Amino acid sequence: MYKRQLPLDLLEKAGPLSEEEYKTMKTHSELGYERLKENINISSKTKMGVYMHHENVNGSGYPLGLRGDQIYMFAKIIHIADVYDAITSERPYKKAQSPKEAIEFLMNNAGKMFQPEYVKAFITYIPVYPKGRNVILSDGNVAVVVENRQYHTLYPVVRRLSDGETIDLAEQNENLSEPLSILDFER
């Protein structure tokens, strides 16, 4: 949020950031807040969400090093969405990772970086594999996602393209010792 106020060469740098560059990058939360501060059409909760969206629930974030309940709820929500977007987006310095990898990162960092119940809500309602998207199954077949289930976002219903068979990956995951899973999106 508000990273566009930072120097373009910093945003597009292909390699790792120096300590000074990282320090500059971390100012975007404050820059965004300063830009919104005087706007009466934007709620104070939204402004504080922008300011605090890099705070981690364990206190290791920035700009203030807040923890737990010191962080506005909206900031905790923005933080999850921002990290998900960062992981799944192509950047000059890294390739995009799959939604599954992003969800796994969020789940592995619930309670450290993220409020656990917000991570749970996010992965419950955000489909990891969008309907209509072709995916590669663990058996090497390509399938299309035909349905997402609210509480099984990592295991949608798919239709295998080779034979048209519809497979409920959530059901398979619960009932088979070696269930099919999705390895990646078809590129």
Predicted regions and their residues:
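Histidine- and acidic-residue-rich, metal-dependent catalytic cores
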Residues: 3-187
